Amino acid sequence: MARFEDPTRRPYKLPDLCTELNTSLQDIEITCVYCKTVLELTEVFEFAFKDLFVVYRDSIPHAACHKCIDFYSRIRELRHYSDSVYGDTLEKLTNTGLYNLLIRCLRCQKPLNPAEKLRHLNEKRRFHNIAGHYRGQCHSCCNRARQERLQRRRETQV
């Protein structure tokens, strides 16, 4: 992987990094900043889709794999949880409309789309302040959590 010595010239988004390296998302080989494994193709696309930032260690760009994103999101939640608020309260606290706020998923870090934010409002679900940023749950993580709860119930029933 190429080195980017000058911090002012470093691309911080994966598509920009691909442009700088004259490659494509399909062909880039980038390692996870946490576990040091090379990201699989699906993980590269997920990282780009989630609009996450590329980080640099010793001037070398790194991303994060799916497992590490899930794991460190949970760690961040446990260590830095502050409070939870409803959507209308969040709008009043920030003086910004809910649809203009960048709210990421609690688990996978994907930015919530307007439909997912509306789901939080309609179902009276709270947004959680974790390390100074509000988080919710995207549709797929919400369904995954529901499936995990159902599985645990089935396992505990006699």
From Swiss-Prot:
It is found in: Host cytoplasm; Host nucleus. Pfam families: E6. GO terms for molecular function: DNA binding; PDZ domain binding; zinc ion binding. Transmembrane segments: none annotated. Its main location: host cell. A motif (PDZ-binding domain) lies at residues 156-158. Keywords: Activator, DNA-binding, Early protein, Host cytoplasm, Host nucleus, Host-virus interaction, Inhibition of host innate immune response by virus, Inhibition of host IRF3 by virus, Inhibition of host RLR pathway by virus, Metal-binding, Modulation of host cell apoptosis by virus, Oncogene, Transcription, Transcription regulation, Viral immunoevasion, Zinc, Zinc-finger. GO terms for biological process: DNA-templated transcription; negative regulation of DNA-templated transcription; symbiont-mediated perturbation of host apoptosis; symbiont-mediated perturbation of host ubiquitin-like protein modification; symbiont-mediated suppression of host cytoplasmic pattern recognition receptor signaling pathway via inhibition of IRF3 activity; symbiont-mediated suppression of host type I interferon-mediated signaling pathway. Disulfide bonds: none annotated. One of its GO terms (cellular component) is host cell nucleus. A zinc finger (unnamed) spans 32-68, 105-141. Belongs to the high risk human alphapapillomavirus family. The cancer-causing human papillomavirus E6 protein has a unique carboxy terminal PDZ domain containing substrate. Belongs to the papillomaviridae E6 protein family. Plays a major role in the induction and maintenance of cellular transformation. Acts mainly as an oncoprotein by stimulating the destruction of many host cell key regulatory proteins. E6 associates with host UBE3A/E6-AP ubiquitin-protein ligase, and inactivates tumor suppressors TP53 and TP73 by targeting them to the 26S proteasome for degradation. In turn, DNA damage and chromosomal instabilities increase and lead to cell proliferation and cancer development. Forms homodimers. Interacts with ubiquitin-protein ligase UBE3A/E6-AP and thus forms a complex with human TP53. Interacts with human NFX1 and MAGI3. Interacts with human IRF3; this interaction inhibits the establishment of antiviral state. Interacts with human TYK2; this interaction inhibits JAK-STAT activation by interferon alpha. Interacts with host DLG1; this interaction leads to the proteasomal degradation of DLG1. This is Protein E6. The lineage of its organism: Viruses, Monodnaviria, Shotokuvirae, Cossaviricota, Papovaviricetes. The gene is E6.
